[in-house]
């Protein structure tokens, strides 16, 4: 199977393994090198601090012309991530460019944990609470992190 992988995916995978992003691990699946097991540590300056979040990342056949498919497997209370783990992030949708890489996507998701954006929500109920009672939303996010994101 590895013989069929485009050079770009092989190079990106090698770089991710040799030079990992701080707070993020991304390991290709043994049976499918287009599928990555991702772990992101909750940033220290966020309600997700102390948590470790599991994600799955899949590179479609069209990659890099099409964006990777990424979703959270760990439950998270965040206005830009819905109950199914889907992520509202422009570079995963209309702002995707073949110049971007897996590492850019992972860094952007990590940044989204530090800076939730209730103005562009995917989970409207969470976003509403974030806008009307941010302190309570942060408290809930911390509680969910303790409940669901412990390694």
Swiss-Prot record:
Q: Which UniProt keywords apply?
A: Ligase, Transferase, Ubl conjugation pathway
The question of whether Ligase is a record keyword is answered with yes
Q: Which domain of life is it from?
A: Eukaryota
Catalytic activity reads: S-ubiquitinyl-[E1 ubiquitin-activating enzyme]-L-cysteine + [E2 ubiquitin-conjugating enzyme]-L-cysteine = [E1 ubiquitin-activating enzyme]-L-cysteine + S-ubiquitinyl-[E2 ubiquitin-conjugating enzyme]-L-cysteine
Q: What does this protein do?
A: Involved in protein ubiquitination, but has no ubiquitin ligase activity on its own. The uev-1-ubc-13 heterodimers catalyze the synthesis of non-canonical 'Lys-63'-linked polyubiquitin chains. Involved in sorting Lys-63-linked polyubiquitinated maternal membrane proteins for degradation by targeting to multivesicular bodies. May be involved in the ubiquitination and growth of intracellular polyglutamine protein aggregates. May have a role in AMPA-type glutamate receptor trafficking in neurons.
Q: Which family does it belong to?
A: Belongs to the ubiquitin-conjugating enzyme family.
Q: How does it assemble?
A: Interacts with the E3 ubiquitin ligase nhl-1 and the E2 ubiquitin ligase ubc-1. Heterodimer with uev-1.
Q: What is the protein name given in its UniProt record?
A: Ubiquitin-conjugating enzyme E2 13
- Give the species this sequence originates from: Caenorhabditis elegans
Supply the source organism's classification. Eukaryota, Metazoa, Ecdysozoa, Nematoda, Chromadorea
